[in-house]
Amino acid sequence: KEKLQRMAQTLGIAPNVIFTGKMTHDELLPILSKSKALLVNTVKDNNMISIVEAIAVGTPIVTTDVPLNSTYIKDYQLGIAKKQWDESDLNDVVSNSEMYIENCMKYRYKLSTKQRVEQFLEIERERLDDGKK
């Protein structure tokens, strides 16, 4: 954490960066919903609930192509997901924030429990219908 804080100071962005440390879910969501983007720079963690939570509150994602979520982030334009992102990608998310936020708000239903149950029931209906033929 200290190394990142020093880097933020060196880059002159410290006033615009918040290092929160560990937070409860209730503490996180209000901050996440006001954020320009959720930045996830991972090389191995491939299934992150924080990405789903960010999309659910309309916060665009900037991540590597490692998380499983990266596929639908790219497909539905919920943010940037690529091997190496940089300042131009961050500028893109900020400059086009309305589009990314709107896309997140439209997509979040697909991540809901209700949608997952409906998908399961549809698959089961199709299976039963195929058995009748």
What are the language-model segments listed below?
Residues 98-131:
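A charged, aromatic-enriched C-terminal amphipathic alpha-helix characteristic of glycosyltransferases
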Residues 22-23, 30-35:
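Short alpha-helical donor nucleotide-sugar binding micro-motif in glycosyltransferases
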Residues 29, 51-56, 70-71:
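Short alpha-helical segment that forms part of, or immediately flanks, the ligand-binding pocket
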Residues 43-44:
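Aromatic "clamp/platform" in nucleotide-sugar-dependent glycosyltransferases that forms part
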Residues 60-63:
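Short hydrophobic beta-strand element within catalytic cores of glycosyltransferases
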Residues 39-40:
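A short hydrophobic beta-strand element within the catalytic core of glycosyltransferases
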